Amino acid sequence: MGRAKRIPYGVSDFIDIIERNQYYVDKTMYIPKLEDEPDALFFIRPRRFGKSLFISMLRAYYDIKRKDKFDKLFGNLWIGSHPTENQGKYQVLFLDFSKIGGSIDQLEENFNAYCNECIDSFIETYQEYYPERVVESVLKAKTAARKLNAIGIAAEKKNLPLYLIVDEYDNFTNVVLNEQGEEVYTALTHASGFYREIFKVFKGMFSKIFMTGVSPVTLDDLTSGFNIGWHISTKPAFNQMLGFSTEDVRELFTYYKENGEIRPDSDVEAIINEMKPWYDNYCFSKSALKTQSKVFNSDMVFYYLRNYRETGEGPENMMDPNTKTDYGKMKKLLQLDKLDGDRKGVLRTIIENGEIIGNIEESFPAKLLVRPQIFISLLFYYGMLTIKGTRGEQLVLGIPNNNVRKQYYTYLLEQYDEVCAVDEMSLKSLFTDMAFDGQWKPALEFMAQAYAKVSSVRDSIEGERNLQGFFMAYLNLNSYYYTMPELELNHGYCDFFLLPDLTHYDTKHSYIIELKMLSKKDFGAMADNGRQTKAEEQWEQAVEQINRYADAPRVEALRQGTKLHKIIMQFEGYQLRKIDEID
C-alpha cells in the first residue's frame, strides 16, 4: 500500500494538489456543464468553499500550455475519460483581485500595476503565438487597458481564443464600499471609473470568461458596461459544484480509514453526524431542495479531518479559528456597525427564530443595500443564510449550522458589550461548575444580573424575545453543551435545552431552562381567576410546561445518561424575581 494522500487544508493550487499527491474531491464533471452555459459566467459562493481551487482546476484544464499534461493532471479524474473539445485550447489570463490593496489614493495605481504584471506575464508565457512587435508593444504599454487592447487586436487577427479567469472580482471594491463609502465606490464602478473601463475591455476580447466572488453587488453596478455575464450561482445544476456532498465526506473519511491514517475503529457515520450540525446544511438553489443533499463547507471538513488524524477525535473547538478572520471581514462587508433599525430587525428575527421569510435577489446595486430585503439576500450570498424551504412563493431562509450561528451570537454579544461589558471569563468558569457539579444557580443568576445591567441602560431591549436572545447569546459561550432553543418536546417548545457534548467532555448534567417574563405592571396584578397574582399563575403554568417537556420520550436519549435539571426563571421587567429547580 502506497503512502496516503496528504490533506490539502488551505491549498488552492490544483496542480500542486495533483503533483504532490494530495486528496482531491473530483469536481471535473462540472466542466461540460459550464461549457453548455453562455460564454461569460459569474459564480458567487461564501468564503472557504473552494472557489480558488476550482478556478485553478479550470486554468489547468483549458491552458494551451498544459495541453500535453492532460493525462498527468486529469487522467485519474472524471474528465480524464470524458474530455471536451475545448481542453487545452485557450490562452488563459488569470487575475486575483484580492491581491490589490493600499489606500484609496493609491488604488488605481495599484490596480493598474497588478494588472500590468499579470498581462506582462501572460504575453511572455504565450509569446510564441504573437509577432515580436506585438510582444514588445504590450510590454512597453503603460496601462492595463492598452496592453489588453494590443493583445486583443493581435489575437483576433490570428484567431487565437482567449480565456479570462478572475478570482474575487469584487474583493477590493467591497473594501472600498465599506471603508470609503458609496461615493468613492460609485466612482470606480460607474461612468468612466477605471474598474468599469477595464471590464469594457474584457467584454470585447475574451472568448470565455469565468469570475468568482462573494457578493453580486459589484456585478450589478458593472453590468451596464459589461452586459454579457450570466449569473449561475443559484442554478440547481451548480448547487454542489463547490463544497462537499455527504457522499464526498463519506468517501474522504473512508479513504483515510482504509489507508491507516485515522483510527481503524473510526465510525465514519458517527463522524459525519458530528460534523453535520457544524459544517453542513447549505443549499444554494430552490430547485435543489428536494433533489440534492445539502452541502458541507469543504474547508471545515478538512479542518476536522486534520484534527481527527492527529488526535483520534474531532477538534475540541468545532469552529476553525480562521473563522474569526472571516467574521471580521464579513462584519465589514455587511457594515454591521452601521446598521439602521430595519436591518437590525432582520438580524434580530434571524437570531431569535433561526430563520426568516424572504426572497433572493440575483443582483442589486450598492445603493439598495439599505433595504431590508436586499440585506437578506446579502446574508444569503455571504453564507449566513441558506435555503431551508418554501412558504408559498417565498423562501424560508435559515441559519445553516452552528458555525454560522456562533457568528450571529458574536454580533449579538458585541452589541450587548457596547452597552455594558460582561465578564465572559468568569461566566465560563461558572459554566464549568454547571456542567460537572450541577451548580446551575451561580451561572444563571450571573446572566440574569448582566441582562438587568444591559437593559437598565437600554430600555428598548426589554421584552421576552430579547430576554431569550440575550440568554441564547451567552449560553452559547459554553463549550460543554449544544444550546438548543425552541426544541419541540411533547407538542410544545422549551426555551432552551442544554444538550451535553459528551464527545469532548465528560459532562454530568443537562438542563431544560424556561424563561418567563411579566411587565412591572402585570407582575403583582391579580389574575383573571381572582385567586392569585399573574406572576403566581404564570409560575404554575411554567411548572406544568417544563414537567411536560421533561416527560417527552426523546428527552431520555437527549440527556445521554446525565442528570436532567428543570429550571424556571421568572422576570419582572428586566429583574429576575424567582429562580428554582422543579423536582
Residue ranges and their predicted role:
Residues 98, 167-168, 202-227, 568-574:
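A short beta-strand-to-loop transition that corresponds to the Sensor-1 phosphate-sensing loop
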Residues 150-158, 184-209:
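Substrate-engagement module of ASCE P-loop NTPases
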Residues 218-225, 232-306:
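Amphipathic alpha-helical segments of the small helical/lid subdomains adjacent to P-loop NTPase cores
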